[in-house]
Design a protein with these regions (language model features):
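N-terminal alpha-helical interaction blocks
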Residues: 5-190
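Cys/His-clustered metal-coordination modules, chiefly Zn-binding fingers
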Residues: 163, 167, 174-298
């Protein structure tokens, strides 16, 4: 079943129409989000073009690694990713530094992200490649060291890095999906969508935790009624690399616990339009979730 998406501008307009109180929070990020989306689309189109030779290549999806809970990019060298990261920084840093919280750190951010790539065999590893490895592996000490060397607060570098690394990582994820489709000769699916292939609450590509989940709508397959379904399957979404994956409805994505009473569903009183928060009674984390069966606008 093919998926479609709308523009950043239209998405924000729809959200603000439903939640006017969010306008001053969302509008300042509109240009930045739109630029990130556009660049991710450009890199994805270039890297997944079979006639193109450029772009980084993701590792091959391995069922054995996935069974051990290892995301696709965990431990990947990522050498040379710095080139596309610099391209992303050239486009996104001016918009990032227009934000009040980052304006005073623009020089340090430019020095870090816009330096010429370091790719020689005898050269020290490029800091942008090291940054990507630290973020994808969850290596907090390495990340703090990079922030200290750059003269940036770790939380500030993380905020900027999540925007700047996102377009190249989304292109890598799309290339991994394409490789899986060629291998399995099936469209509109990824290797981690195979039944039981990925059972973790974190992203199968980059290892980040989801920012949102959703329950899908009922669907009808015209060519084969046996493939139709009542909907309600749960999916999670990673904002860093743009990956979606299936997940068990009664399980916490953060701590992995399941069973009766583990996950509580919190809704606002009145017409919630399928919007809710799935809250874990065990680890006290939560995931915003949208039940598309209850939302006719989507």
């Amino acid at each position: 079943m093919a998926l479609s998406c709308q523009s950043v501008a239209q998405t924000l307009t729809d959200v603000i129409a439903r939640r006017p109180v969010l306008k001053p929070v969302l509008r300042p990020f509109e240009d930045l989000l739109a630029a990130r989306s556009a660049l991710a689309g450009e890199l994805t189109a270039a890297w997944t073009n079979s006639a193109a030779a450029g772009g980084s290549c993701p590792p091959e999806w391995q069922t054995e690694r996935a069974a051990r809970g290892l995301s696709l990019l965990t431990g990947a060298p990522l050498t040379g990713l710095c080139i596309s990261v610099r391209t992303a920084a050239e486009r996104l840093l001016p918009l990032l530094c227009a934000q009040e919280s980052l304006a005073s750190q623009s020089t340090a951010l430019e020095d870090f992200f816009l330096a010429p790539p370091v790719l020689g065999p005898d050269s020290k590893p490029d800091r942008r490649d090291a940054l990507a490895r630290a973020m994808l592996s969850g290596d907090a000490p390495a990340f703090r060291n990079l922030a200290d060397e750059a003269g940036l607060a770790p939380e500030l570098l993380e905020f900027a890095a999540e925007f700047i690394l996102s377009p190249p990582l989304r292109a890598l994820a799309a290339r991994a999906v394409q490789a899986g489709q060629v291998e399995r000769e099936g469209p509109n699916s990824a290797p981690w969508d195979e039944e039981g292939a990925w059972r973790q609450g974190y992203c199968p590509v980059c290892g980040s935790f989801p920012v949102i989940g959703w329950l899908d709508k009922p669907f009808f397959e015209e060519k084969n009624a046996f493939l139709s379904g009542g909907g309600g399957k749960k999916h999670l979404y990673c904002s860093l690399c743009g990956t979606n994956w299936k997940f068990r409805r009664g399980t916490c994505p953060s701590c992995g616990k399941d069973g009766n009473g583990v996950m509580e569903i919190l809704r606002e009183s009145g017409a919630a339009r399928g919007e809710r928060v799935d809250w874990c009674t065990s680890c006290k984390t939560y995931c915003p979730t949208l039940d598309l069966r209850e939302n006719d606008a989507i």
